[in-house]
Amino acid sequence: MCLILSIFTLIAFHIPFFRHVLSCLEGGFNGMIITTSLAVLMLALNYFFYYLLLYSGRFVGKCILAFTFIADAVSLYFINAYEVLITDKMMGNVFNTQYSEASGFFSMSAILYILFLGIIPCIYIFRRKVDYGTFRRFLSNVGISLAIAVSVALVNMKNWPWIDKNATELGSLLMPWSYTVNTVRYYSAEKKRNAKEILLPDARIATDSRDVCV
Protein backbone atom coordinates (compact mmCIF):
# COMPACT_ATOMS: atom_id res chain seq x y z
CA MET A 1 0.00 0.00 0.00
CA CYS A 2 2.75 2.46 0.94
CA LEU A 3 4.61 1.76 -2.30
CA ILE A 4 1.44 2.31 -4.33
CA LEU A 5 0.78 5.60 -2.55
CA SER A 6 4.39 6.68 -3.07
CA ILE A 7 4.23 5.97 -6.80
CA PHE A 8 0.87 7.74 -7.06
CA THR A 9 2.26 10.78 -5.22
CA LEU A 10 5.27 10.91 -7.54
CA ILE A 11 3.20 10.70 -10.73
CA ALA A 12 0.10 12.68 -9.76
CA PHE A 13 1.57 15.61 -7.86
CA HIS A 14 5.04 16.22 -9.22
CA ILE A 15 4.69 17.07 -12.90
CA PRO A 16 5.35 20.79 -12.10
CA PHE A 17 8.36 19.74 -10.02
CA PHE A 18 10.01 17.76 -12.81
CA ARG A 19 9.04 20.38 -15.38
CA HIS A 20 10.98 22.91 -13.31
CA VAL A 21 13.90 20.49 -12.86
CA LEU A 22 14.18 19.90 -16.60
CA SER A 23 13.98 23.64 -17.31
CA CYS A 24 16.95 24.25 -15.00
CA LEU A 25 19.13 21.43 -16.35
CA GLU A 26 21.31 21.57 -19.43
CA GLY A 27 20.44 18.01 -20.37
CA GLY A 28 22.91 15.26 -21.09
CA PHE A 29 23.83 12.27 -18.95
CA ASN A 30 24.28 14.25 -15.74
CA GLY A 31 20.85 15.82 -16.16
CA MET A 32 19.34 12.38 -16.52
CA ILE A 33 21.17 11.24 -13.37
CA ILE A 34 19.83 14.18 -11.36
CA THR A 35 16.26 13.68 -12.58
CA THR A 36 16.29 9.94 -11.92
CA SER A 37 17.92 10.39 -8.53
CA LEU A 38 15.31 12.93 -7.45
CA ALA A 39 12.53 10.55 -8.45
CA VAL A 40 14.07 7.65 -6.52
CA LEU A 41 14.74 9.89 -3.52
CA MET A 42 11.14 11.08 -3.47
CA LEU A 43 9.84 7.51 -3.71
CA ALA A 44 12.04 6.40 -0.82
CA LEU A 45 11.22 9.33 1.47
CA ASN A 46 7.49 9.22 0.78
CA TYR A 47 7.48 5.46 1.37
CA PHE A 48 9.26 6.03 4.68
CA PHE A 49 6.80 8.77 5.67
CA TYR A 50 3.68 6.78 4.71
CA TYR A 51 4.92 3.55 6.30
CA LEU A 52 5.87 5.32 9.52
CA LEU A 53 2.47 7.02 9.72
CA LEU A 54 0.47 3.86 9.05
CA TYR A 55 2.46 1.61 11.36
CA SER A 56 2.65 4.01 14.30
CA GLY A 57 -0.68 5.77 13.87
CA ARG A 58 -2.93 3.00 12.49
CA PHE A 59 -6.35 4.68 12.02
CA VAL A 60 -5.01 8.10 13.02
CA GLY A 61 -2.22 7.59 10.50
CA LYS A 62 -4.80 6.90 7.80
CA CYS A 63 -6.59 10.14 8.71
CA ILE A 64 -3.34 12.11 8.45
CA LEU A 65 -2.58 10.47 5.09
CA ALA A 66 -6.05 11.34 3.82
CA PHE A 67 -5.55 14.96 4.85
CA THR A 68 -2.18 15.13 3.06
CA PHE A 69 -3.66 13.86 -0.21
CA ILE A 70 -6.45 16.44 -0.12
CA ALA A 71 -3.91 19.14 0.74
CA ASP A 72 -1.67 17.88 -2.08
CA ALA A 73 -4.56 18.17 -4.52
CA VAL A 74 -5.39 21.73 -3.42
CA SER A 75 -1.72 22.75 -3.58
CA LEU A 76 -1.33 21.27 -7.06
CA TYR A 77 -4.42 23.15 -8.23
CA PHE A 78 -2.98 26.50 -7.13
CA ILE A 79 0.43 25.67 -8.60
CA ASN A 80 -1.07 24.82 -11.99
CA ALA A 81 -3.83 27.44 -12.06
CA TYR A 82 -1.93 30.43 -10.67
CA GLU A 83 1.72 29.38 -11.10
CA VAL A 84 2.49 29.94 -7.42
CA LEU A 85 5.25 28.44 -5.29
CA ILE A 86 4.30 26.98 -1.92
CA THR A 87 6.78 28.96 0.18
CA ASP A 88 6.57 30.14 3.80
CA LYS A 89 5.29 33.52 2.57
CA MET A 90 2.62 31.76 0.53
CA MET A 91 1.54 29.78 3.60
CA GLY A 92 1.36 33.07 5.49
CA ASN A 93 -1.03 34.38 2.85
CA VAL A 94 -3.11 31.22 3.18
CA PHE A 95 -3.46 31.53 6.95
CA ASN A 96 -4.21 35.26 6.81
CA THR A 97 -6.77 35.12 4.01
CA GLN A 98 -10.46 35.02 4.91
CA TYR A 99 -12.69 32.32 3.46
CA SER A 100 -14.77 34.85 1.53
CA GLU A 101 -11.62 36.06 -0.22
CA ALA A 102 -10.11 32.61 -0.77
CA SER A 103 -13.29 31.15 -2.28
CA GLY A 104 -12.87 33.43 -5.28
CA PHE A 105 -9.71 31.57 -6.28
CA PHE A 106 -11.52 28.23 -6.63
CA SER A 107 -13.20 27.05 -9.80
CA MET A 108 -14.81 23.90 -11.15
CA SER A 109 -11.39 22.48 -11.97
CA ALA A 110 -10.48 22.74 -8.27
CA ILE A 111 -13.33 20.36 -7.47
CA LEU A 112 -12.00 17.90 -10.05
CA TYR A 113 -8.50 18.13 -8.55
CA ILE A 114 -9.85 17.44 -5.06
CA LEU A 115 -12.14 14.64 -6.26
CA PHE A 116 -9.72 12.64 -8.41
CA LEU A 117 -6.44 13.39 -6.63
CA GLY A 118 -7.76 13.78 -3.08
CA ILE A 119 -11.07 12.05 -2.36
CA ILE A 120 -10.53 8.89 -4.44
CA PRO A 121 -7.10 8.18 -2.86
CA CYS A 122 -8.72 8.75 0.56
CA ILE A 123 -11.35 6.13 -0.22
CA TYR A 124 -8.59 3.72 -1.21
CA ILE A 125 -6.68 4.44 2.01
CA PHE A 126 -9.65 3.75 4.28
CA ARG A 127 -10.99 0.74 2.36
CA ARG A 128 -7.64 -0.99 1.92
CA LYS A 129 -6.85 -3.46 4.68
CA VAL A 130 -3.30 -2.90 5.90
CA ASP A 131 -1.01 -5.75 6.89
CA TYR A 132 1.13 -4.04 9.51
CA GLY A 133 3.37 -7.05 10.05
CA THR A 134 5.87 -7.44 12.85
CA PHE A 135 8.09 -4.81 14.41
CA ARG A 136 11.07 -6.52 12.79
CA ARG A 137 9.46 -6.09 9.39
CA PHE A 138 8.77 -2.45 10.21
CA LEU A 139 12.43 -1.83 11.04
CA SER A 140 13.50 -3.65 7.88
CA ASN A 141 11.26 -1.62 5.56
CA VAL A 142 12.13 1.66 7.24
CA GLY A 143 15.84 0.82 7.14
CA ILE A 144 15.74 -0.09 3.45
CA SER A 145 13.92 3.11 2.47
CA LEU A 146 16.35 5.25 4.46
CA ALA A 147 19.33 3.36 3.05
CA ILE A 148 18.10 4.03 -0.49
CA ALA A 149 17.62 7.73 0.29
CA VAL A 150 21.09 8.05 1.83
CA SER A 151 22.69 6.12 -1.05
CA VAL A 152 21.08 8.40 -3.63
CA ALA A 153 22.25 11.46 -1.69
CA LEU A 154 25.83 10.17 -1.52
CA VAL A 155 25.94 9.24 -5.20
CA ASN A 156 24.87 12.80 -6.08
CA MET A 157 27.31 14.66 -3.84
CA LYS A 158 28.76 16.52 -6.82
CA ASN A 159 25.26 17.68 -7.76
CA TRP A 160 24.44 19.13 -4.34
CA PRO A 161 25.55 22.67 -5.36
CA TRP A 162 22.94 22.61 -8.14
CA ILE A 163 20.28 21.34 -5.74
CA ASP A 164 21.22 23.97 -3.14
CA LYS A 165 21.04 26.70 -5.79
CA ASN A 166 17.49 25.68 -6.72
CA ALA A 167 16.41 24.54 -3.25
CA THR A 168 13.72 27.20 -2.75
CA GLU A 169 11.91 26.45 -6.00
CA LEU A 170 12.33 22.68 -5.71
CA GLY A 171 11.17 22.58 -2.11
CA SER A 172 8.10 24.67 -2.88
CA LEU A 173 6.95 22.09 -5.46
CA LEU A 174 7.45 18.96 -3.34
CA MET A 175 4.37 17.26 -1.93
CA PRO A 176 3.59 17.00 0.93
CA TRP A 177 6.80 18.61 2.16
CA SER A 178 6.22 22.06 0.65
CA TYR A 179 3.25 23.12 2.77
CA THR A 180 4.18 21.10 5.89
CA VAL A 181 7.74 22.39 6.20
CA ASN A 182 6.85 25.93 5.14
CA THR A 183 3.95 26.03 7.62
CA VAL A 184 6.44 25.29 10.39
CA ARG A 185 8.82 27.91 8.98
CA TYR A 186 6.05 30.51 8.84
CA TYR A 187 4.90 29.99 12.43
CA SER A 188 8.48 29.84 13.65
CA ALA A 189 9.18 33.21 12.00
CA GLU A 190 5.95 34.64 13.44
CA LYS A 191 6.87 33.45 16.92
CA LYS A 192 10.25 35.17 16.69
CA ARG A 193 8.71 38.32 15.26
CA ASN A 194 6.09 38.54 18.00
CA ALA A 195 8.42 37.66 20.84
CA LYS A 196 8.39 40.37 23.51
CA GLU A 197 11.64 42.08 24.26
CA ILE A 198 12.83 41.27 27.79
CA LEU A 199 14.11 44.53 29.26
CA LEU A 200 17.01 44.49 31.69
CA PRO A 201 16.61 46.38 34.98
CA ASP A 202 17.94 49.92 35.16
CA ALA A 203 21.63 50.20 35.97
CA ARG A 204 22.48 51.32 39.49
CA ILE A 205 25.59 51.77 41.60
CA ALA A 206 25.97 48.84 43.97
CA THR A 207 28.33 50.53 46.47
CA ASP A 208 28.87 54.05 47.78
CA SER A 209 32.65 53.82 47.57
CA ARG A 210 34.51 55.42 44.71
CA ASP A 211 36.12 52.77 42.52
CA VAL A 212 38.66 53.36 39.78
CA CYS A 213 38.32 51.42 36.53
CA VAL A 214 41.51 50.88 34.55
Regions found by a protein language model. Name each.
Residues N156-V214:
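Membrane-interface segments at or immediately adjacent to transmembrane helices
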Residues M1-L173:
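Transmembrane and membrane-interface helices of multi-pass
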